[in-house]
Every structure is written in structure tokens, then in C-alpha cells.
């Protein structure tokens, strides 16, 4: 209590100010300690009590019936958590159930109460999924919270490459390129990754490109664009057809060219619409596309197959009419190679030269470079076995278009294609994740089974008593027989002693 005195003017006033200063009393310290202890132990005790309520609320004839071993474990942990280590004597032979319970309880030894509570809750977590959902179970789940472990997938290099790259395909829209050469590997899975990557861009433009398919124009010229940094000029052809009879022979003749083209980018076929082209340049230029593995054009989706029929079947003067749009049609073999042949129809005049600049001159006429008297071998970029373009005939001329080797993909994106490859990629990712989860569960089950087998083997190897299993008494049969016969033998010996004594007296 603190008193303050003030003097004001002609009168004197006393103002009493009471300041209560908190004092750390012993009973307050004890109360705070009890609250802190209640907070710290409430976590384990609350979970333990909720788990005990779940076990006690199980109906006798319910859908979930725990085994005897499971109930013995719960009993032993409950007794250890509530009463501590077992200090009682073992029940007699007339109480076999009590003896089993005593054995389970005493096997825990000096386990603390907190450890017993934790073990009780952990045992409950193993079976909580198989139990019917009741109010007690919901309360236990609310108290425990999320108890599932988040296990990261540990995959080998091949499987991790597949899932990680396919995951990047779904989020990234740009292809990897270094110095004008698309990065590639020898696995067939990466070809599906690049296909799925470009399908996402093609799906967005599917609506607009389908409408442009119906437009018509008059003149058309077929032009080959090689995006590998080399300058190659080819003539045009009025017909694109497939021929499989010469694929084996040409595969042997063009191995050097194929090896050089494997290190380059993608081969693109472009259909240019140019009204000022010289008619003399329209000659036989582009020959057929063949495959090392099969004799047919491989299509990834039904829409692509229909588009390739549109270009490859019938008169090109009818089917290539109205090609005022850009479309990339990927031709990939069935073995998963990612060699890409892009057919592109570009409306207007001009070309793209080395460096990516427009090929038109200042006067508006396209810059042309012609090369005659030589034979060109064009091969699609192959991985393993891929598509190949045979060499062109001698004296072919045409418009050449190249890239500057800067790694950029120029031209329009892939046209409309179906979502078949995208769905396949997603299914593969989910299937692989499910397989990894199944393998992890199987591994856990195997380890659990091995530990249980080891535990049962240890318990079976413990020295058992000499009595048979059917004997109901605690002592052995021989000891019981001796206990029964011993009084008779003792009485007989006493009787013999008295008889001899009487004979001596007589």
C-alpha cells in the first residue's frame, strides 16, 4: 500500500493511492506449474483417452472384430499407461486368460506411462482405417490430426526423367534448344514429352486453324525449309507420296548424311503460296518420305491422320488449295524417335534466310539462291530409327530457307492436333506414381511381416516348461504323481519300521 501526500493552496488534501504490486506467492507458483504440466501432457493424454473410448465403444457383434493378439497389445499398453510397470503376481493355472494378460503386461518391462500412451495411439493408427466411422472415431481423428507420412518418390534415373520431363511439358511451352540444335536423348519417352509439349500449343489454336482449312487460293509452291543452319535449296514437287520399297536400300546409301543430320535441328516442309513465282521452277523436287521401321506414315492422332490424308492423298492442286495457314504435321516413327518433319504452308512471298531475317529485297522481290548440278540428301533428324527424306534428283532447284543457328524455333506453332498424346502422358504419369505408391506399401508390408515373423520365432524359442500342452496343472505330471504316491510310501516305510521293532521286542 503506497500513500502519496499533496498540498494545494490554503487547504490540505490527502489523496490515498493504492498500488497493488503482484507478489510471487508459493501457491501461485504451484498453480502455474500445474497448468503448464496440464498443457504439456494434455496432448498425449487426450489422444490416449480418445483412443481408449474408441476401443471401449466397439460393439461385440460389429463389423470390426479385433484379434486376440491385438486386444492383448491394447490391454498391456493400457495397463502400463494407467498403472505403470506390472508388480502383481502371476495368476494361478485356473485363470488362463488372466495369465495371458499378465504375460502381455509384464513383457513391457519398465516402459514409462508416456511411452505406453504413445504406443497405444500408434497401434490405433494402424487399424483406424478399417473401423466404421462413428462419433468416437471422428473425435479421435480430430484429436490426432493428420498422421499420414509424406513419402517422396525415390525413382531411378530413367523413371525420374520421364515423370519430371513430362511434368515440365505440362507447365512449359518452350522447347529446349542450344545453338540451333534441339536437345535430345536416345529414349523414346522424351519424344512423347516433346509431342505433348507442342500439343498444348496446338490445342489453343485448333479452333482458328480448322476454320482456315476451308479457305481457298489459286497458286501454290512446295518449298523445303531446313532449320539446321545449312544452306540447301530444293525444287518443288506437285506430288508427295510414300514409297516403302526403297527404304532399305536408301538406308544403306545415306548413312553419312543421316549421321550428320542427327546432330541438327528439325526438318520442316513448308508450302509457300507465292503469286510471283516463275513457272519454270515448278518441277519434280520433293520425293517421298520413308521410314526405317515401317512403310506407312505414323500419325499420333486421328486429326493429324486426317490432315496428312488431305495433303498426301489425291491431286495436290485440289488438296493444297486454300493453304493460307501454317501447320506443322509431325511425322514420328512408332519406335519413339523424335525426328520432326514440319509441313508448313505460308501465305505470301519471301523467305527466311540465315539469321532469321526476312528474305525479301528492298524492291519487294524475294531473294533467291539457286544451286544446280548437284544432288542433295535430306534426312529427318532421327534417334535410333527415324523418318528419312531420300535424295533429290540432279539439277533440282528451289527456294532455300535456313535459320541462323540461334536455337529459336521460327514459324508457326503446331496446328490442331488431338489431345491423345496429352492424355497418354498424363495416364503414364499417374500410373507410375500409383506403381511407386504400391511398391512402397508392399515394402512396408514386407518389413512388417519380417519383423512379426522374427518376433514369433523369438517367442517360440523361449524355454518352455516340461509339461505337455494338454496338462491343465502348473506342476509337471511326474511331480504330481510323486506327490500323490509319497504318502503311501511313507506310511509303508513307517509300518515296516514298527514291525521290525515289535519283532525285536518279542
UniProtKB/Swiss-Prot annotation:
Residues 175-217, 234-302, 345-417 are annotated as: Disordered. Residues 44-133 form the ACB domain. The keyword Transport applies. It is a single-pass membrane protein. One of its GO terms (cellular component) is peroxisomal membrane. Residues 258-267 have a biased composition (Polar residues). It comes from the Eukaryota. The keyword Metal-binding does not apply. GO terms for molecular function: fatty-acyl-CoA binding. The modification N6-acetyllysine is found at residue 444. Residues 181-209, 426-451 form a coiled coil. Residues 198-217, 238-257, 348-360, 406-416 have a biased composition (Basic and acidic residues). GO terms for biological process: fatty acid metabolic process; pexophagy. It is found in: Peroxisome membrane. The chain crosses the membrane at residues 478-498. It holds the Pfam family ACBP. PANTHER family: ACYL-COA-BINDING DOMAIN-CONTAINING PROTEIN 5, ACYL-COA-BINDING PROTEIN, ACBP. Belongs to the ATG37 family. This is Acyl-CoA-binding domain-containing protein 5. It comes from Rattus norvegicus (Rat). The gene is Acbd5.
Amino acid at each position: 500500500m503506497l500513500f502519496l501526500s499533496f498540498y494545494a493552496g490554503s487547504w490540505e488534501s490527502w489523496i490515498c493511492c493504492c498500488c497493488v504490486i503482484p507478489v510471487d506467492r508459493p501457491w501461485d507458483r504451484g498453480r502455474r506449474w500445474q497448468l503448464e504440466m496440464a498443457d504439456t501432457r494434455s496432448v498425449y493424454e487426450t489422444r490416449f483417452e480418445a483412443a481408449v473410448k474408441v476401443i471401449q465403444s466397439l460393439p461385440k457383434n460389429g463389423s470390426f472384430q479385433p484379434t486376440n493378439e491385438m486386444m492383448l497389445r491394447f490391454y498391456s499398453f493400457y495397463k502400463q499407461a494407467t498403472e505403470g510397470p506390472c508388480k502383481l503376481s502371476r495368476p494361478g493355472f485356473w485363470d488362463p486368460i488372466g495369465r495371458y494378460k499378465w504375460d502381455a503386461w509384464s513383457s513391457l518391462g519398465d516402459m514409462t506411462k508416456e511411452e505406453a500412451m504413445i504406443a497405444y495411439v500408434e497401434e490405433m493408427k494402424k487399424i483406424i482405417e478399417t473401423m466404421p466411422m462413428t462419433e468416437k472415431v471422428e473425435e479421435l481423428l480430430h484429436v490426432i490430426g493428420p498422421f499420414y507420412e509424406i513419402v517422396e518418390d525415390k525413382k531411378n534415373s530413367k523413371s525420374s526423367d520421364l515423370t519430371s520431363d513430362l511434368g515440365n511439358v505440362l507447365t512449359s511451352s518452350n522447347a529446349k534448344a542450344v545453338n540451333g540444335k534441339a536437345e535430345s536423348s536416345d529414349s523414346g519417352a522424351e519424344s512423347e514429352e516433346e509431342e505433348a509439349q507442342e500439343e498444348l500449343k496446338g490445342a489453343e489454336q485448333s479452333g482458328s486453324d480448322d476454320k482456315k482449312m476451308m479457305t481457298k487460293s489459286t497458286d501454290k509452291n512446295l518449298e523445303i525449309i531446313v532449320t539446321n543452319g545449312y544452306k540447301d535449296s530444293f525444287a518443288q514437287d506437285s506430288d508427295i507420296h510414300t514409297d516403302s520399297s526403297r527404304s532399305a536400300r536408301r538406308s544403306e546409301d545415306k548413312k553419312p548424311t543421316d549421321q550428320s543430320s542427327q546432330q541438327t535441328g528439325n526438318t520442316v516442309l513448308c508450302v509457300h503460296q507465292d503469286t510471283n513465282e516463275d513457272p519454270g521452277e515448278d518441277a519434280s523436287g520433293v520425293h517421298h518420305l520413308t521410314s526405317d521401321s515401317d512403310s506407312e506414315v505414323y500419325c499420333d492422332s486421328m486429326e493429324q491422320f486426317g490432315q496428312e490424308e488431305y495433303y498426301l492423298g489425291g491431286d495436290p492442286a485440289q488438296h493444297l488449295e486454300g493453304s493460307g495457314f501454317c501447320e506443322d504435321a509431325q511425322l514420328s516413327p512408332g519406335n519413339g524417335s523424335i525426328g520432326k518433319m514440319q509441313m508448313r504452308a505460308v501465305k505470301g512471298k519471301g523467305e527466311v534466310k540465315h539469321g532469321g531475317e526476312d528474305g525479301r529485297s528492298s524492291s519487294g522481290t524475294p531473294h533467291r539462291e539457286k544451286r544446280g548440278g548437284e544432288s542433295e540428301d535430306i534426312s529427318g533428324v532421327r534417334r535410333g530409327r527415324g523418318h528419312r527424306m531420300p535424295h533429290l534428283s540432279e539439277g533440282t532447284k528451289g527456294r532455300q530457307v535456313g535459320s541462323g543457328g540461334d536455337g529459336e524455333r521460327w514459324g508457326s506453332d503446331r496446328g490442331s492436333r488431338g489431345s491423345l498424346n496429352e492424355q497418354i502422358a498424363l495416364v503414364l504419369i499417374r500410373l507410375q506414381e500409383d506403381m511407386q505408391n504400391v511398391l512402397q506399401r508392399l515394402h512396408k508390408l514386407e518389413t512388417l511381416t519380417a519383423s512379426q515373423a522374427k518376433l514369433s520365432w523369438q517367442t517360440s524359442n523361449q524355454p518352455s516348461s516340461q509339461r505337455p500342452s494338454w496338462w491343465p496343472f502348473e506342476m509337471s505330471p511326474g511331480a504330481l504323481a510323486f506327490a500323490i504316491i509319497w504318502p503311501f510310501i511313507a506310511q509303508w516305510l513307517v509300518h515296516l519300521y514298527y514291525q521290525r521293532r515289535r519283532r525285536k521286542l518279542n
